[in-house]
Amino acid sequence: MRNVVKPLKGKTMNQFVPKLFDVMKGYSKKQFVNDVIAGIIVAIIALPLSIALALASGVGPEQGIYTAIFAGFVISFLGGSRVQIAGPTAAFATIVAGIVAQNGMDGLIVATIMAGIILIIMGFLKFGNLIRFIPYTITTGFTFGIAVTILVGQIKDFLGLDTSAYTGPTIETLDKLNAVFKCINTFNWQALVVGGVSLAILIIWPRFKKLEKIPASLIAVIVSVIMVKLGMQAKTIGDLYTISSKLPGISIPHVNITMVKNLLPDAFTIAVLAGIESLLSCVVSDGMIGSRHKPNMELVAQGAGNLVSALFGGIPATGAIARTAANVKNGGRTPIAGMVHSVTLLLILVVLMPYAAWIPMPAIAAILFMVAYNMSGWREMISLCKTSPKSDILVLLTTAVLTIVFDLVVAIEVGVVLTALLFLKRMADVTEVKSWKYIGDNIDENNDPDRINLKHVPKDTLVYEINGPMFFAAADKFLDIQTVSGSKAVIVRMRGVPSMDVTALRSLRNIHAVCKRHGAVMILSHVNEQPMSVMEHAGFADEIGRDNFCANIDAALEHAKNIVEG
């Protein structure tokens, strides 16, 4: 009696169990203390970043905190990573700003809810492992483009420009640059000094190893506030926004079918970005702690986190690599640290949020300059441009330029389509059709340098060998298979064909029809599993005759010999 291996249902179901429930087994008091300390430190790091990223996204500063609190807690609680810290990230800044400018907060809530639903569906459909199929050139290109967009968007605040009199559009990157040039006469040197000092602190502070546990962004904010209080003239958050320290209520958007249709591309882009960035953060953190995350559960958690964030007035969220790394470095090893980070931010919101009104806008701009620099990957961009094939460079630069000039939705759509077309061309270039020449029985094999590669081909027999995938982009190459009048057998060797589509099958059918008109028999040699399945499903295997399928080239040549001599 044979042993039957049954599928591991328990293992399949376990991938949808939050990591929190796994790590609670054997959880110690010592680890709890480490998680609490790490969570508090990460919250201090996240505070200025959340405010800055919210402002860069065109929403109020408290909405960045809401996102880190609600989305951060849910994603840590349900997530597939032990140490993931989630919240607002720079990747969403440009797309969120565009949605808010065109559709208001209702549009942002609807887009974020749809993105959350898409992420949950992706998780349950086990798309966690498919995210890696997004080409590296696309992710590098749009990340660089986002960095440039963020940097350009902060120039006006860094220079203290007054753009209140400017009436032109300021949504696209080029529009923002135009606004800077039009309003350059309102330049405020004191704001530049505040921003310059903040930027210097952000660059220099991390070099002091003994002080690295104190976030440079927090020091920059404190110093800039002191400078303004001492008389430096620079606009603060309080000058531009009304800040609330109250907990938000549930936001129910005014929605209609037209809005849903218009925002669907944005929602899909948010979902893809959240999936890519969160899973990339998981991979990085896995390497730091020697663990393995659950990608599908992480996508479900990201979706749930974005749903909750939207309902409580937040913006899109995902795993933040820098904050996750800080969590690990400070001793965080379980999702408890991420949950403590969110609770700490909640306490800060209630107690200290009114003081955020004191933060100068040039300091926020300096923080975002550093965020843009760190995420830009400019060294990697240069390296890829120097070492990559021209087709990859084309995708890289196209995605980056489209992100800067237009928006992320257009960039990703064009980047994916362009990559697909270039991939098809590469596969088509790989596919080749070679013909064998007739080798008679009188060849001197001992003195022929090519004797190893030669086989005896019967008279009136044509032999062709196909290497590479048989698909629509390579279909024209099959026209090289020709039937000469007088031929009695045509062998097509398919050992090197891993796959076939219906377009290629149609070409093969046409070749078979030509063979029949010339009175020749078509023989297929060494047909692999997938092409054979396509032929059987389409009825071509019976059409050509099962006897005309041979296991290898020797059997095919012998079969052809019998046909010719018969």
For the regions a protein language model found, what residue spans apply to each?
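Short, contiguous clusters of charged residues that form electrostatic/catalytic patches at enzyme active sites
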Residues: 38, 199, 203, 476, ...
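The feature marks cytosolic C-terminal regulatory regions of anion transporters and related permeases
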Residues: 374-543, 561-566
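Transmembrane helical cores of multi-pass ion-transport proteins
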Residues: 2-443
